[in-house]
Amino acid sequence: MKRAIFTFYNLSIDEEIVRLQSEVLKKLNKTADFLPLCSQTHGEEVIHPQGVEYGFNELFNKGYDTVMLLDVDCIPLNQYALEYTFDQAEKGKLIGNAQIGAHLQNPEHMYAAPSTFCLSRQMFEEFDKMTFMPDHRNADTCGFYTLEAEKRGKEVEFYMPTHFQRRPRNHVWDLGQGRGEYGIGTTYSNHLGVNMFYHLFETRLNIYNSLFYDKCDELLK
């Protein structure tokens, strides 16, 4: 299987975040091509969903069998996290970090979020190469894939938040239905209880970035 990991960011993102994510992946990634996608723009000139849409289509068109998307402030916590995620996607699952969109029509619908989101080309083609773009009513970025997988009876595996480091400025984000909360510096685990991915959130604010630096330093020792 030909595997790829990509992340999308622009020139407004803290360069140290970009560098450290790359270093962590260089250490832990053994089987996939890591292909960072940098838009030579600032702010909202090219928005994140557009980069995600471009990245998946481009990589599948180039012949990759399985593609993992990571937010630039999201990192695997061990080699197993990457291998397990790819393996499950290649078995026909949609897999990623759990999230909800409080502004959506169904605010408690859980979907595989673009912070960690892994998809096989087989599923991409089976779903008629559907869009990764949000409509902000029924789905956020990548959200239509979870909706379509559920509709077709495909298995969706979620990495659930187990703990986080800081409360967000307004309030903690709650998955609802007793499924847990997430916030700044969230660790996500699989159903076996293994810590898989760490996602900082709100990197663009440049408030919490030192937490990401510290987590990466921990992993790079």
Segments predicted by a language model, with ranges:
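A structural signal for short, well-ordered beta-strand segments and their strand-loop junctions
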Residues: 35-36, 69, 94-97, 118, ...
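Conserved catalytic core of nucleotide-sugar-dependent glycosyltransferases
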Residues: 45, 75-148
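Short, surface-exposed amphipathic charged segments that create phosphate/polyanion-binding patches used
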Residues: 49-53, 107-113, 171-180
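Short beta-strand-to-loop acidic/aromatic patch adjacent to the donor-nucleotide binding site
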Residues: 64-75
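C-terminal catalytic/acceptor-binding lobe
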Residues: 139-221
